[in-house]
Regions:
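Conserved beta-strand elements of the Class I
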Residues: 1-5, 75, 142
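Short, Asp-centered acidic motifs that coordinate Mg2+ and/or phosphate
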Residues: 40
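Pocket-forming structural segment of enzyme catalytic cores
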Residues: 86-164
Length: 199
């Protein structure tokens, strides 16, 4: 069972639809008992980092997520991926979950590329990662973001190029993060979700 975490700032149903399409058992919940009993967790997220962290705290989920991430696989998606890091500088400075070392900062792409970075972009593999077993260099996935992770290369399974090297898929222990939306990324994204479900 994969539990999709419901804290008020996630694109829950598109993720659930993708898992349902794959035949993966899942639920959407904010209940601590469901999070504890789940085999794996997905932390979706849309919007602003400070608001999302506040909602996660107010839902009483911050500490249980940190604890469960030591025991089971966790995937953060888009803003949910950014929340895995130590802190973000979006609208000031806000502490994150601290599950992957690094920060989240406004992108400064070269060549006057506009932000937000919206659309399809190709993945460039970096460090070995189980989630990329079905993915080839150059496969395209779908992005929507203005901020990006700043972290050691050893934590980056794949980058994309958007006038700068953008960490697209990050990892640390049981914790994985997709800056892109796997649930909106066609065959490539579904393959990543299927592999995550089978970990």
């Amino acid at each position: 069972m994969i539990t999709i975490l419901d804290y008020g700032a996630g694109n829950l149903f598109s993720v659930q639809n993708a898992l349902n399409f794959l035949g993966v058992e899942n639920n959407i919940s904010s209940k601590v008992e469901d999070i504890i009993s789940a085999d794996k967790l997905i932390l979706p997220g849309v919007g602003a980092f400070p608001d999302a962290m506040k909602m996660l705290d107010e839902a009483g989920l911050t500490e249980v997520i940190k604890e469960q991430a030591k025991k089971k696989a966790l995937m953060g998606i888009c803003l949910g991926m950014q929340m895995l890091f130590d802190k973000s500088y979006e609208f000031g400075e806000t502490e994150g979950l601290g599950l992957i070392p690094g920060t989240v900062e406004l992108m400064h792409p070269a060549n006057d590329l506009v932000i937000p970075h919206i659309g399809w972009n190709s993945l460039e593999k970096n460090e070995p990662c189980k989630l990329l077993e079905s993915v080839n260099d150059g496969d395209y996935v779908y992005f929507v973001h203005s901020y990006a992770a700043v972290t050691d290369s050893k934590n980056v399974a794949a980058y994309c190029d958007y006038g700068m090297k953008v960490p697209a898929l990050v990892m640390s222990g049981n914790v994985y993060g997709c800056q892109f939306h796997p649930e909106k990324s066609g065959k490539t994204g579904l393959g990543i979700l299927k592999t995550f479900a089978s970990l």
